[in-house]
Design a protein with these regions (language model features):
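Aromatic-lined substrate-binding rim segments of carbohydrate-active enzymes
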Residues: 124-211, 230, 239-243, 356-364, ...
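A conserved amphipathic helix/loop scaffold
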Residues: 465-467, 583-802
């Protein structure tokens, strides 16, 4: 072998080959180094050392040192026995004692599922070593299949195997316990794309390139049968390469990646274009329409077009059609129904495309791989019009979650003002309900990320970096999610103190998973995917108001809230909740109303509906009667009138003016809130088995919501007396992230034998229900334990490497 980065003079050296860090076997051997730093190691030496190296994987890591006088050299080498075959690893998802996560070969991974190991030709060896040193062994490994394919779409398996072995060996040398999380990109080679223009996506503005595609060449349509067939074959063959690799016992995980940045965010928004007008997509839409309408007569009636049928090349709605309709809801009946249909179809079709490849991956791996995708960016795309909202195709989560071929979805959080607050990008409660897990991409910027990343969250100093790392950890714990560190191989996390803090978070995570976790959310927020196709594709002041408050206000409620999709009404255990808040239930139908009444409107529970619940249905027209059936409270709806502020006995709020004002028009209800102009903007009605409340605002701020929820006997757990901080909850753990400090008060749900800071060890009190403490006037996160003295010992003495 040739010694890497070797400057030794030629000669004989005392060689020692053994376990990494001197733990275990050490075998000595005289070794000659020639002028090219080439050495020979006897086979019997390698065999003896290999057999005694620690670990149960086929590929193992040894350390070689050479010494002669003052000349010294050390490197790591990976060894394996070619006569043996690695048993392919297994990856699964589990939920136990109130916690959730991945299992790799039956062993729990923990909330921290890995770090970036290989990206765009660069290997993060030192980073892998540092993360491995604190027990974070997952290595995100980006694989561009097209790099190993020819212009006919054929995979060169030998080249792929050689590249995998070389790259994985380098990472394994840095972390002997590593396992690999393969991010498999489904792009076709640019040469293939040039040969098959009829299979590629088609942009409405005539642009013939894609900013984020390989070579900026247009890529295949989601609906291209040729792409699906050929890439499906490549995926099967690649998985077979994984299974035959000496690293097979280190590959438990596969993430399917396509479209912009591999995140299944459909092409077009960088090009300011609507897509996809390719013939394959036109035909796929036609098949969906035939399934929905059955006959061309029914389609023509729904669309108001005498020329409509299921087979033409102009079914996908034009730019003009997509931009028709109201400033908020499309409405318009037949005039905009083609756009409603297309966006309903496309959410399903995007999810189905992922499932097509997920099924192949599961079958090819003997169902041993954990399989998932970037998907379900509910908040990240919401209202980002045009090109980025419904066009992302990210609102088919309900379909994905019902499939046994998907184990996880996830992605990065929203990037806006991350230093101020953070929420995960998906509806995590529903993901957990279906036995899956949301896996966040933890691309936290630190003080080492540079000025060019300032708008994405670069911190001012180490202290702020650690504060945000602690906050993000607790947010993922609360949402029962996993996450991995993703620094684009720029080594943002290299600060020793930062890594020490992450190591302590690992210990806290290990302790929490060893006990039975009891969460205390009394409120559930329900979000609708069914509503998405009915919302405008234009810029909307109302949608901007929603997004602003979702980003800036919901993380500051100071009480635990669980998030679910409305499609899971029949799965949610509502017995846990006093209040169910329907955030954006603009669309409703008879079945949805039936489920709300059957599952949620029971046992004295309060149902809160925001803004314009149930005002649109399958007719794609305003339907106040349907709204009244959903809520029991009548509304007047004026799409052309503006609204802004709202006031009530518990508080008031100002907001930017937005069109589409709703007002209470029911004389039989109790009015509880008003618009700025004095018209009724909130009402309640008491039924025999539940209470219904309507608030005529798209999403009130944190102060208003806290007051409303307190009115319904929902307890605040954080006072907010020195500012509304981001407070997160996970079993007996509470974290407070404050940027300005001051006096803080927490009210516990039950008395705690001990309250302690899990980083400093400070005991804040014993046998108390109210906790008072101070925080410094700078960004800081305190993670507190509040519970029994016996369980506190578990956290105090935890080992994150267990």
């Amino acid at each position: 072998m040739i010694l890497p980065e070797c400057r030794l003079p030629a000669g004989k050296y005392r060689g020692v080959l053994g376990a990494v860090c001197g733990q275990g076997i050490k075998a000595e051997q005289e070794i000659r180094v020639d002028e090219d730093c080439l050495i020979e190691l006897p086979a019997e030496l390698l065999t003896r050392v290999y057999r005694e190296l620690p670990g149960d994987k086929l590929v193992r890591t040894a350390e070689l040192s050479l010494k002669n006088g003052d000349d010294f050299y050390r490197c790591r080498i990976t060894l394996y026995d070619p006569k043996q075959k690695a048993v392919p690893a297994t990856g699964t998802v589990y939920s136990q004692n109130g916690s959730a996560g991945f299992l790799v070969n039956g062993k729990p991974v923990g909330t921290h599922s890995g770090s970036l190991g290989f990206w765009e030709g660069r290997i993060a060896g030192e980073s892998a070593s540092r993360f491995g040193g604190i027990g974070i062994d997952g290595s995100v490994f980006l694989l561009n299949a097209y790099e190993f394919m020819d212009s006919n779409g054929q995979l060169n398996r030998e080249r792929l195997q050689s590249a995998l072995n070389q790259r994985m060996a380098q990472i394994t040398a840095r972390n002997p316990n590593v396992y690999f999380k393969i991010y498999f990109h489904l792009y076709m080679p640019p040469a293939w794309c040039k040969k098959h223009p009829e299979e590629l996506i088609k942009l409405d503005n005539g642009t013939d390139s894609l900013e984020m595609a390989p070579g900026k060449i247009r890529q295949p349509s989601y609906a291209s049968e040729l792409w699906r067939k050929q890439m499906g074959t490549v995926l099967r063959q690649a998985i077979q390469v994984f299974r035959e690799s000496p690293f097979a016992d280190r590959i438990p995980y596969l993430r399917l990646c396509y479209a912009n940045c591999g995140e299944w965010n459909h092409w077009g928004y960088h090009e300011h274009a609507f897509v996809d007008y390719s013939l394959p997509m036109q035909r796929a839409f036609g098949k969906w329409l035939k399934k929905k309408y059955g006959t061309e007569e029914a389609l023509r009636k729904a669309w108001g077009r005498d020329d409509a049928d299921f087979n033409p090349d102009n079914l996908v709605p034009s730019r003009a059609d997509r931009l028709k309709g109201g400033d908020f809801l499309r409405l318009g009946g037949t005039e905009t129904q083609n756009s409603v249909d297309y966006y309903a179809f496309f959410q399903e079709f995007a999810a189905e495309t992922i499932l097509y490849f997920a099924k192949i991956a599961k079958e090819a791996s003997g169902r041993r791989l954990a399989v998932g995708a970037y998907y379900g960016y509910y908040f990240g795309h919401y209202g980002s019009n045009p090109y980025h909202f419904q066009d992302s195709g990210n609102y088919g989560v309900g379909k994905l979650l019902h499939s046994a071929d998907i184990d996880f979805i996830g992605g990065p959080a929203q990037y806006h003002n991350r230093r101020l607050q953070l929420e995960l990008n998906g509806i995590t409660g529903s993901v957990n309900l279906h036995g899956k897990i949301w896996e966040s991409e933890g691309d936290q910027r630190t003080h080492l990320s540079g000025e060019k990343n300032k708008s994405l969250g670069t911190t001012d100093n180490l202290s702020e970096s650690i504060a945000i790392a602690k906050r993000d950890f607790m947010l993922n714990l609360q949402r029962k999610s996993s996450y991995y560190f993703y620094d684009f191989v720029f080594d943002w996390y290299r600060d020793p103190e930062f890594m020490t803090a992450v190591g302590r978070l690992r210990e806290i995570d290990s302790a929490l998973r060893s006990i039975r976790r009891k969460d205390h959310a009394e409120t559930a927020f329900l979000f609708s995917e069914e509503t998405i196709p009915y919302l405008t594709s234009r810029g909307s002041g109302l949608l901007r108001e929603f997004v602003k408050n979702q980003i800036a206000e919901l993380p500051r409620l100071g009480l635990p809230v669980d998030y679910y999709l409305m499609s899971d009404l029949d799965r949610i255990d509502f017995s846990r909740y006093k209040v169910v808040l329907f955030v954006n239930a603009y669309y409703a139908d008879n079945e949805m109303i039936r489920k709300v009444q059957k599952y949620a409107a029971k046992k004295g529970r309060t149902l809160i509906f925001l803004h314009a619940p149930g005002v649109v249905g399958d007719s794609n027209r305003l339907d106040p009667e349907q709204s009244a059936r959903l809520t029991g409270i009548r509304l007047a709806v004026n799409p052309d009138a503006s609204a802004a502020g709202i006031r009530a006995a518990w508080g008031q709020m100002k907001s930017a003016a937005y069109r589409f004002r709703t007002e209470i028009s029911d004389p039989s209800v109790k009015i509880i809130a008003y618009h700025d102009n004095g018209t009724p903007a909130g009402a309640e009605r008491q039924f025999s088995d539940h209470k219904s409340i309507v608030i005529c605002h798209p999403l009130p701020n944190a102060v208003f919501l806290r007051g409303l929820l307190a009115r319904e006997k929902i307890r605040w757990l954080a006072s907010g007396k020195s500012g509304l901080d981001q407070v997160n909850f996970a079993g007996p753990l509470i974290s407070v992230y404050s940027r300005s400090g001051g006096a803080k008060t927490l009210w516990l749900t039950e008395p705690a034998e001990i309250v302690a800071d899990l980083f400093t060890g400070e005991i804040l009190g014993k046998n108390l229900k109210t906790v008072n403490f101070q925080m410094p006037p700078r960004p800081e996160t305190r993670i507190l334990y509040a519970g029994s003295a016996a369980e506190y010992e578990v956290f105090r003495t935890a080992n994150g490497k267990d």
